[in-house]
Amino acid sequence: MEKQILFSKLNGFVHGGDYNPEQWLDRPDILEEDIRMMKKAGVNCVTLGVFSWSVYEPREGEFHFEWLKKIMDSLYENGIYTILATPSGARPAWLDKKYPEAMRVGKNGQRNHHGVRHNHCMSSPEYRKKTALMDKLLAEKFGQHHRAFLFQNPLRDFYLMIKSVH
């Protein structure tokens, strides 16, 4: 049987981790230095978007994805591919303020406060609607993007291969 390598440009081995450059959008020098250090460490793939919801959608219905494309382009130009994650585990403050039912209720019957990771109430219709919309928009914008090869949805614990990297 012939051995097949799924990610041939990555030598069959994905090496990297989560990367959160959205905190440095006003500092392109930091992105450049991060990429230099990633290349030095042999990183060939990073996960983007895990905590980006408040940057993607700073106000309800106002979406900004252009910064993500620029970062994906810079990474790709340096031999680093993207696993694109949905940001469902870190909701923006506006969502919790407007839809407090999106926050989990603890065993004590008290609703958790904003700012806790993965503090979502899975049965909240508004939370489910908002995460479905975000997933849909990311898939439409980046599903066929040559820089991304996996789509990660931590809320639903799966990875979806977009395409083989060759």
Tell where the protein language model's regions lie, with residue ranges.
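Polysaccharide-binding and catalytic clefts of secreted carbohydrate-active enzymes
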Residues: K98-P100, R104-H166
